[in-house]
């Protein structure tokens, strides 16, 4: 099968190819006419200072606040703190700066070297809203994108690194029995985070190759196709506006 993108070995990605597909995905978000969706769904292209590698970060509220003021507080008053020696670089583009709707929160680093007690992004004291952070990293062994995810600020002090919390807050009902039957191989797995080394959940990439082989897509659409396959089982759907073809 001929593929539009210039891949070295489809559907695997080299480090350079992963950088490109991440950049294309970020630009789709920046240019898409998302309207109010931008207030509850944030995508950022980031780069770690420790390794220089790129990754995609996606921030989503688990529940929409009833009041608009609370929604604004939840996303616009993140405690960014001061960037320290281990912070990652937020790769904002000039195109996004021109987008009046793209009010992306300035998150404190999660992925540097030495981390202080305030390293994880938290909402302001005025608006504690539970949320999930998804990250797309290149797996060093499978050479495929891998979806990592962490829960934050759950109500009543519920544990965030807990498989039952994942099923309660992220996994749609139609996926629960299938994921539980799959187990840790090919389903939801847990391991040290690829950057922080802190335990985190991820979707095991062992079956991604077979799923991607049936598609023919350019690098510009690689992550759109990939997330369409792996994201839904943990509550991640890419806004359809991002799939619109540019004029």
Map each language-model feature to its residues.
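Extended, low-hydrophobicity segments enriched in charged/polar residues
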Residues: 1-132, 139-142, 154-246
């Amino acid at each position: 099968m001929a593929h539009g993108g210039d891949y070295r070995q489809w559907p695997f990605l080299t480090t350079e190819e992963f950088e490109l597909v991440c950049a294309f995905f970020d630009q789709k978000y920046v240019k898409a006419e998302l309207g109010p969706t931008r207030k509850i769904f944030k995508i950022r292209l980031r780069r770690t200072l420790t390794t220089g590698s790129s990754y995609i970060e996606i921030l989503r509220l688990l529940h929409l606040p009833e009041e608009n003021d609370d929604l604004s507080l939840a996303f616009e008053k993140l405690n960014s703190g001061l960037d320290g020696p281990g912070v990652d670089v937020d790769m904002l583009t000039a195109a996004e700066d021109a987008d009046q709707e793209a009010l992306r929160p300035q998150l404190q680093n999660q992925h540097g070297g030495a981390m202080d007690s305030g390293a994880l992004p938290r909402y302001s004291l005025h608006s504690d809203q539970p949320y999930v952070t998804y990250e797309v990293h290149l797996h060093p062994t499978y050479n495929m994108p891998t979806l990592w995810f962490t829960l934050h600020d759950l109500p009543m002090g519920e544990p965030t690194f807990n498989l039952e919390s994942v099923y309660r807050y992220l996994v749609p009902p139609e996926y629960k029995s299938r994921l539980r039957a799959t187990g840790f191989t090919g389903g939801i797995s847990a391991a040290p985070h690829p950057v922080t080394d802190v335990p985190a959940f991820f979707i095991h990439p062992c079956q991604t190759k077979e799923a991607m082989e049936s598609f023919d897509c350019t690098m510009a659409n690689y992550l759109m196709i990939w997330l369409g396959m792996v994201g839904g089982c943990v509550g991640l759907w890419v806004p359809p506006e991002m799939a619109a073809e540019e004029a």
